[in-house]
Amino acid sequence: MLNLAGSLTQGTVTWMTGPRTLGDHTAPTINAAAERAGRPAPRVVAALPVCVTADVDTARTRAGEEFQVYGMLPSYRAMLDREGAEGPADVAIVGDEDVVAAQVRALADAGVTEFVASCFGSREERDRTRSVLRSLL
């Protein structure tokens, strides 16, 4: 699919695909296909659950519960397996403001051109998450 997307489309959008898979598989594959087709570099949009929190363990448990279904769907399961992730909680971006900001920034190093955050957690955590994300614009 990435070869087809790179040769015919403007890019791809991922969900539940972690940074290692984005950097080692997704971005290089779609970019190489675009180059072979003489097309401009495609967009690589990554979407992941994000929570700024002081309680990382609880947030990861919550992510595992809220996003559990994605670990059971074959296409998402394949990306989680490629990442070495047991489930969605393992690819969720979770931590304090500095940790979350660093992990979001690192996605660009993996070849991501745009990021979509699915904020989760308590109202306070979602507010903190949105604040960090705004600071990265």
Predicted feature residues:
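Active-site-adjacent structural elements that line small-molecule/cofactor binding pockets in enzymes
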Residues: M1-L137
